[in-house]
């Protein structure tokens, strides 16, 4: 009897060890190194990038929003300039303080915090209209998107994580469950999200919580989530700054996020051994059929702020060098 019991115990231990080893292997993500193929700092003798706020790639065209220039630049995939979209000025059609951009069916939407509105432009760069929201209702600078004339934007309101605004008829609804941090200030500042569109679903990515969530846009219910707190790049900062996060503040761990095909790309943010800012690794996540960490993409620079992706090519804004780089696998 004791022998049988011993065999059962050994079998259970072996199974648990095997499961543990399998989980450990899953955590060992392959690192893929990228190199710089080309870059752009500006165009001509007077137009230089300095405060890039967003990057988008759509139908072989790259869109760059720059807050200092108060314009959106449209280029081809090799940085050849096609046109400038919008202009700085005091008028209702002019830019004041541009942030994130989004594209839907050849329409470009630019969120301007000066107007507290999403301004719409057609494929020729002509102004088509805008939809205004109060500043204290929304979070910027975070990614937003438009789907079937509905605007999806991260909200500071208690009713949900993000707003769905039907711009045709003006109706609104709140979606997503906010995390409760126990106090009003962290509840307000730590529930911001990057929002990305994927197959009639909304992907939410926090810049201070290591979690990705997917919401169905019809049911407004969360259908999947993924915790990535085990990634070495951010793990040490999460542990080191545990006390700081308790003091009505938060630790930034994500600089940007982008969807291309069936993959989500999360640009991680951390600190080096000497306390220097690092943002040069991307966590690549498979979206369907379930969320799954795939690999780590190592970028050649040290501090990138924004990214967009076209298949295996990455466009990244190098904050230190004030330029947009085209990066490819080594």
Give the role of each language-model region.
Residues 35-47, 85-93, 133-135, 173-188, ...:
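Surface-exposed loop and turn segments in beta-propeller and other repeat-based domains
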């Amino acid at each position: 009897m004791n022998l049988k019991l011993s065999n059962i115990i050994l079998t259970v231990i072996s199974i648990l060890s095997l499961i543990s080893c399998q989980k450990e292997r899953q955590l060992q993500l392959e690192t893929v190194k990228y190199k710089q193929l080309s870059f752009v700092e500006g165009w001509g003798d007077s137009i230089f990038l300095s405060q890039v706020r967003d990057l988008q790639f759509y139908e072989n065209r790259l869109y760059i929003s720059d807050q200092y220039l108060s314009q959106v630049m449209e280029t081809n995939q090799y940085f050849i300039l096609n046109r400038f979209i919008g202009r700085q000025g005091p008028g209702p059609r002019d830019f004041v303080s541009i942030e994130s951009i989004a594209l839907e069916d050849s329409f470009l939407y630019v969120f301007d915090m000066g107007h507290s509105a999403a301004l719409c432009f057609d494929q020729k760069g002509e102004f088509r209209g805008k939809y205004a929201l109060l500043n204290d209702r929304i979070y910027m600078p975070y990614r937003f998107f438009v789907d079937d004339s509905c605007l999806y934007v991260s909200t500071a309101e208690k009713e949900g994580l993000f707003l769905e605004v039907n711009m045709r008829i003006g109706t609104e609804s709140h979606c997503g469950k906010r995390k409760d941090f126990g106090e009003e200030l962290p509840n307000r500042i730590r529930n911001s999200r990057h929002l990305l569109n994927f197959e009639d679903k909304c992907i939410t990515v926090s810049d201070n919580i290591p979690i990705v969530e997917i919401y169905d846009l019809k049911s407004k219910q969360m259908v999947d989530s993924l915790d990535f707190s085990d990634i070495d790049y951010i793990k040490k900062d999460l542990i080191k700054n545990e006390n700081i996060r308790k003091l009505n503040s938060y630790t930034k761990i994500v600089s940007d996020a982008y969807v291309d095909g069936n993959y989500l790309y999360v640009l991680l943010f951390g600190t080096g051994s000497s306390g220097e800012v690092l943002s040069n690794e991307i966590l690549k996540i498979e979206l369907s059929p379930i969320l799954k960490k795939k690999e780590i993409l190592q970028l050649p620079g040290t501090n990138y702020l924004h990214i967009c992706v076209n298949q295996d090519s990455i466009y990244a804004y190098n904050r230190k060098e004030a330029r947009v780089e085209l990066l490819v696998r080594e």
